[in-house]
């Protein structure tokens, strides 16, 4: 028979095991765009995941998106602290956050979900006049844009290197305008481009510049 002491030793670690980190999940859906649906999950510890569902894209890498993507991501301390501060200031999204009305054009259905030991909540919206929700939406969309650009650059590197120059210029502009963030998530590809003498020097230089500017935490 198992003694009470043995049972206690088995149960105690379960009672005192650390709670999983809080998470924010952002879902975007728009049938007119590629990818037509994606989900970003960010943990308060910086871990995360990106999953997208879209069309096949063209073989030369010119179309907007490749097929579905599912990959881990990392979110820097500065960005994730901003994200979780917004969640806590807005009741963990357990509130109405859509202010679209009939006069606001459809911009995609967005869902924010918070799950953590301190609370939980969900809100669905097309557009929100809440500036904090707006900034959070921009952050998630900018991370997704970085991953999408990385996917396009990968396809172009494999199938159509002549278009790398113009695509890197687009990414560089997006980064400077804040429309693409968390560049470290495509760092392996940028390192490949920076070190490949077979691609244009402008591509190499831009890749190095983006790597130098990306956060390291």
What residue spans do the PLM features occupy?
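Bacterial N-terminal signal peptides
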Residues: 8-15
